[in-house]
Amino acid sequence: MRSLLVLVLCFLPLAALGKVYGRCELAAAMKRHGLDKYQGYSLGNWVCAAKFESNFNTQATNRNTDGSTDYGILQINSRWWCNDGRTPGSRNLCNIPCSALLSSDITASVNCAKKIVSDVHGMNAWVAWRNRCKGTDVNAWIRGCRL
């Protein structure tokens, strides 16, 4: 019994770790969270953005030259959208800790992304979407998925 307890305690932190989603798995999760056609952007746009922002990895982080960091599956920036406790002048417009964006549960990322895309720039806020997805056949990202 003691061995089982030790084993459970060793693996308990893994439950809080992030996740690398499969393409169709992420498409289904994003659809459940209401991203399909949100602000006029089809589901394929969101899946494409996630691919080129994080390679579908909820734990992705990238430090920027201005000292801010991008977090999670949609690489949401700490200067404007979340608080990481180390970005001077963070606006935290989504009112969340950046660590919430690294969870295997994409709810916080989706809710924040909805605020971002509702801004005047829409999905142009995501550099990877602008450079790799905009104007392409983004429906290819959900083709073959059972949604």
Curated annotation (Swiss-Prot):
Signal is among the record's keywords: yes
Top-tier EC class: hydrolase
A molecular-function term among this protein's GO annotations: lysozyme activity
UniProt-listed Pfam families: Lys
Disulfide bonding pattern of the chain: 24-145, 48-133, 82-98, 94-112
Catalysed transformations (reactions): Hydrolysis of (1->4)-beta-linkages between N-acetylmuramic acid and N-acetyl-D-glucosamine residues in a peptidoglycan and between N-acetyl-D-glucosamine residues in chitodextrins
Gene Ontology cellular component list: extracellular region
Keywords on record: Antimicrobial, Bacteriolytic enzyme, Disulfide bond, Glycosidase, Hydrolase, Secreted, Signal
Signal sequence, renumbered to the chain: 1-18
EC number(s) reported in the record: 3.2.1.17
Limits of the C-type lysozyme domain: 19-147
Record localization: Secreted
InterPro entries on file: Glyco_hydro_22, Glyco_hydro_22_CS, Glyco_hydro_22_lys, Lysozyme-like_dom_sf
Function: Lysozymes have primarily a bacteriolytic function; those in tissues and body fluids are associated with the monocyte-macrophage system and enhance the activity of immunoagents.
Additional observations: Lysozyme C is capable of both hydrolysis and transglycosylation; it also shows a slight esterase activity. It acts rapidly on both peptide-substituted and unsubstituted peptidoglycan, and slowly on chitin oligosaccharides.
Record-stated family: Belongs to the glycosyl hydrolase 22 family.
Subunit description: Monomer.
Name assigned to this protein: Lysozyme C
